[in-house]
């Protein structure tokens, strides 16, 4: 009985607030230590110190001895009884005696009073502030105080609300602490009377008192436990709303767990910021262990009913099933509600993140629900939630909200995205020694997982190996194959997240997913200290430091750090471009690239600077702009590709494709992020942004393919010449599967084919604003405009001669180097430029055409001569039949 009372007292722990700065503390010792910083060094009045044979008045009048020592050192006074103590630890032990007395218990004979800290031979007494009577123990003093409370009843103080504490004054006046104290005499307690002296109170029976913290605002009735108070409040409010006006003390006393954590993880202790805290973790542990012991005690009558009223998540006790159900909803749905919409969240951080959707920083607004998003891509992904069928369904039964993840999943089924048929397996067949995973934390028993039989799927491909029939993967052990089939090819997802309802195959996946709700990132990178929420994400991140790219394409040899990126890359070789731009016809294999491309048509980029009217396609470019233009600092640039980053950490995380391909493109556009190979090209590209409008200049320009420099070298001769390409630096072999419908020429990208088709259609969408001449590509227009401006940005390092086009500079450099990379396959003559080779090839073409015409003329003349010479002779029948139509066509009459 005593242990239960002590545990109950620990559960309804006090909260202490500093009266000077309103700072909250979980224990009296902490607040007293804190208040020493506010209290100047002063002497306090000793309430009562008596020595055998010496009165208190005489000791005080003498001004010497023990009294002066206590006056100088004692700075800690109990607010309940006024006793002065020497240290915070003694005051804490003294306060626990008050708490033990406040617990409801049967009247028992008084035990000898606990010994106060002995100071020489003196004894500390307790003085009544009303009648100045002295008592030898706290129990007798509290019993005497009840007589004054019954004689002059006073209204109990209002429960403390955080932010506006009620300060309880003390005789000292310097260590005032806001504590919730409301007492009343127990109705079944013994009757005690005031004792004028310590000698007369040695046989006094201790009267029990109880701590009443909760007052009903309707009927002013007092309650000790929050469960009793809530049960009573239900009588006044039969149908409370989900956000009912519950007192703040309920939230301060209850300890809900915002997130359902796994059993293997330690249970978090609520922090003081959420207004429900206990004194320390040990008190919480003792409280929970005591409740579990009482709940598991089957010997008590009604133990089964009591066990049903305990919350399995936080061990909270409730008096009715309705209260328990209402409490369980807080674990499932959350307890923090958005004031602007009806959504609830499990933690304040989730609510703060959600409130950012309502802020004015978002530019794209959903017309159905009012939520705003920072980019158009997020808005389009959110808009699908308002459609009749918001989920992407796969034929295998899985559903996805995100389109990208749905496309990733479909590729696991192979060509067509249709899952292969699986062999049905009896559910009763045992698994090969593999233990069943623990059931999900829903409290309901789940059906056993259908195991996979070895006879139906484990076909030995080689001695000692087992092959999976679904993906042809081989394993060295049957147990490994069984585990692979259970967790890779299993269609159902048994483990559910208690916060958002998302399903997972493994319980470990649920634990990793829960960290996205709690914000926990327990796996830091040893190189840059960046934290991650799972070991897999950490391992993927560490590849950026080591430079390792374990996933390599078998067609072009390009390597990647993730298998999903490799799967996306293979779509390029498969010529799978399902996303088409409606304005210019350019196709993309990823949806976000189409969204990025659409900004070039509209001319409005999503990330706008607050200090100037400029906008940017990427957030990184906006941060770099603010760093350079408004902060006057230099960004961190990649030495391989020239990309700029606002911090060195972002630069270290940068995965440079140019460095891997050894083809640096060192100049990046600060507006759209496009990289070019020279400063002149960058200036021309930025001039296009600054032209009449980005929509007019860049709208019809498809994004240039980011191929290596060697692949862009013009070495392919026209098909009309019908000859091989001249000798040039060899480029990596690439598949060319896009064919022109007019000339049957093949191209590797949709962009190259789109530009080539303008040759047949005659389309020239880029006119010069100075002379009106039109061009098929925007780069040709940029080169042409330099003729009007006289700009020659490309200068030779040897002779200083400048050119308007970089290609002319490259041809000029060959004069100094003597290089002639373009040779004629007919005569072997070589040239410095492809245009000179083209002109030279035309001479061979003209000679070839002249020779063909001469041969045709000679053949025609020979046929006519043969007819004229043999017309008078008798010819065989077969020759006559062959010559007759020819002679008739020439107008020659053949006599018979």
Swiss-Prot record:
Which parts of the chain span the membrane according to its record?
none
Alphabetized InterPro entries for the sequence: Znf_C2H2_sf (IPR036236), Znf_C2H2_type (IPR013087)
Where Asymmetric dimethylarginine occurs, the residues are 832
- Stretches the record annotates as Disordered: 259-303, 434-460, 687-733
Q: Where are zinc fingers of the kind C2H2-type found along the chain? A: 16-38, 76-98, 126-148, 214-236, 309-331, 336-358, 364-386, 392-413, 466-489, 495-517, 523-545, 551-573, 579-601, 607-630, 636-659, 667-689, 738-760, 766-788, 794-816, 822-844
Recorded GO cellular component terms are: nucleus
State a single Gene Ontology molecular function: DNA binding
The modified positions for Phosphoserine read 164, 298, 717
The primary location reported for this protein is nucleus
Residue spans of biased composition, Basic and acidic residues class:
274-287
Q: What Gene3D superfamilies does the entry give? A: Classic Zinc Finger
Q: Where is the composition biased (Low complexity)?
A: 259-272, 707-732
Q: Does the keyword Nucleus apply?
A: yes
Q: Belongs to which family? A: Belongs to the krueppel C2H2-type zinc-finger protein family.
- Record's function text: May be involved in transcriptional regulation.
Q: Which PANTHER family match?
A: C2H2-TYPE DOMAIN-CONTAINING PROTEIN, ZINC FINGER PROTEIN
Protein name as annotated: Zinc finger protein 574
């Amino acid at each position: 009985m005593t242990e239960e009372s002590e545990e109950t007292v620990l559960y309804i722990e006090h909260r202490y607030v500093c009266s000077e700065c309103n700072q909250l503390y979980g224990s009296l010792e902490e607040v007293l230590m804190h208040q020493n910083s506010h209290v100047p060094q002063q002497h306090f009045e000793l309430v009562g110190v008596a020595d055998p044979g010496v009165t208190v008045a005489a000791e005080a009048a003498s001004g010497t001895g023990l009294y002066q020592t206590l006056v100088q050192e004692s700075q800690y006074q109990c607010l309940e009884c006024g006793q002065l103590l020497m240290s915070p630890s003694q005051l804490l032990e003294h306060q626990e005696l008050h708490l033990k007395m406040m617990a409801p218990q049967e009247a028992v004979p008084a035990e000898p009073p606990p010994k106060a800290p002995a100071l020489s031979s003196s004894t500390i007494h307790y003085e009544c502030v009303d009648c100045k009577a002295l008592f030898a123990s706290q129990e007798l003093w509290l019993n005497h105080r009840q007589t004054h409370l019954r004689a002059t009843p006073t209204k109990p103080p209002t429960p403390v609300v955080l932010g506006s504490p009620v300060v309880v004054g003390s005789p000292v006046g310097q260590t005032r602490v806001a504590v919730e104290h409301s007492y009343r005499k127990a109705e079944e307690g013994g009757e005690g009377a005031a004792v004028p002296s310590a000698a007369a109170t040695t046989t006094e029976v201790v009267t029990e008192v109880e701590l009443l913290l909760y007052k009903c605002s309707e009927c002013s009735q007092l309650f000790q436990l929050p469960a009793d108070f809530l049960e009573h409040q239900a009588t006044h409010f039969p149908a409370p709303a989900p956000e009912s006006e519950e007192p703040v003390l309920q939230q301060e006393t209850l300890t809900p767990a915002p997130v359902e954590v796994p059993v293997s993880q330690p249970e978090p202790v609520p922090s003081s910021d959420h207004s429900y805290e206990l004194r320390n973790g040990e008190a919480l542990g003792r409280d929970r262990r005591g409740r579990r012991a009482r709940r598991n005690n089957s010997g008590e009558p009604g133990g089964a009913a009591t066990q049903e009223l305990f919350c399995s998540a936080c061990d909270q006790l409730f008096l009715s099933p309705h209260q328990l159900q209402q409490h369980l909803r807080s674990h499932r749905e959350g307890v923090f509600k958005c004031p602007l919409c009806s959504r609830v969240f499990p933690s304040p951080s989730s609510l703060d993140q959600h409130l950012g959707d309502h802020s004015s920083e978002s530019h794209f607004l959903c017309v159905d629900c009012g939520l705003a998003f920072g980019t158009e891509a997020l808005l389009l992904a959110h808009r699908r939630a308002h459609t009749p069928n918001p989920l992407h369904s796969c034929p295998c039964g899985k559903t996805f909200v995100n389109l990208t993840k749905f496309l990733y999943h479909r590729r696991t089924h192979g060509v067509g995205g249709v899952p292969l048929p699986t062999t049905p397996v009896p559910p009763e067949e045992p698994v090969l020694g593999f233990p069943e995973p623990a059931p999900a934390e829903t409290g309901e028993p789940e059906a056993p997982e259908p195991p996979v039989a070895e006879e139906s799927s484990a076909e030995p491909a080689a001695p000692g190996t087992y092959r999976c029939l679904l993906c042809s993967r081989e394993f060295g052990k049957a147990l490994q194959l069984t585990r692979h089939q259970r967790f890779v090819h299993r269609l159902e997802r048994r483990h559910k997240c208690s916060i958002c309802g998302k399903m997972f195959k493994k319980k470990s996946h649920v634990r990793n997913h829960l960290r996205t709700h709690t914000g926990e990132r327990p796996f830091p990178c040893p190189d840059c200290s960046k934290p991650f929420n799972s070991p897999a994400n950490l391992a993927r991140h560490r590849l950026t430091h080591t430079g390792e790219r374990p996933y390599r394409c078998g067609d072009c040899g390009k390597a990647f750090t993730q298998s999903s990126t490799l799967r996306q890359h293979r779509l390029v070789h498969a010529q799978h471009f399902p996303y088409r731009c409606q304005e210019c016809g350019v196709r993309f294999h990823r949806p976000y690239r189409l969204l990025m491309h659409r900004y070039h048509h509209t001319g409005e980029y999503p990330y706008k600077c607050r200090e100037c009217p400029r906008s940017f396609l990427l957030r990184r470019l906006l941060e770099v702009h603010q760093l350079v233009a408004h902060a006057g600092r230099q960004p961190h640039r990649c030495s391989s590709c020239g990309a700029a980053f606002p911090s060195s950490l972002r630069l270290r995380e940068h995965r440079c494709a140019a460095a891997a391909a050894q083809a640096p493109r060192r100049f990046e556009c600060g507006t759209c992020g496009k990289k070019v190979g020279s400063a002149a090209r960058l200036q021309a590209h930025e001039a296009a942004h600054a032209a009449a409008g980005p929509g007019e200049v860049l709208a019809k320009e498809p994004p240039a393919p980011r191929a290596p420099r060697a692949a862009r070298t013009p070495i392919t001769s026209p098909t009309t010449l019908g000859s091989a390409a001249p000798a040039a630096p060899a480029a990596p072999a690439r598949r060319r599967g896009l064919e022109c419908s007019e000339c049957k020429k093949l191209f590797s990208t949709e962009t190259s084919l789109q530009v080539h088709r303008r040759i047949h259609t005659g389309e020239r969408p880029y006119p010069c604003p100075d002379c009106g001449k039109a061009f098929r590509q925007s780069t040709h227009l940029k080169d042409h405009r330099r003729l009007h401006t006289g700009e020659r940005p490309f200068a030779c390092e040897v002779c200083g001669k400048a050119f308007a086009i970089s290609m002319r500079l490259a041809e000029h450099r060959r004069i100094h180097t003597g290089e002639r990379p373009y040779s004629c396959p007919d005569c072997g003559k070589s040239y410095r430029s492809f245009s000179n080779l083209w002109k030279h090839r035309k001479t061979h073409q003209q000679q070839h055409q002249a020779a063909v015409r001469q041969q045709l003329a000679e053949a025609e003349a020979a046929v006519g001569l043969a007819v004229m010479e043999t017309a008078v002779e008798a010819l065989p029948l077969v020759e006559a039949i062959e010559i007759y139509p020819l002679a008739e066509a020439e107008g020659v009459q053949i006599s018979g």
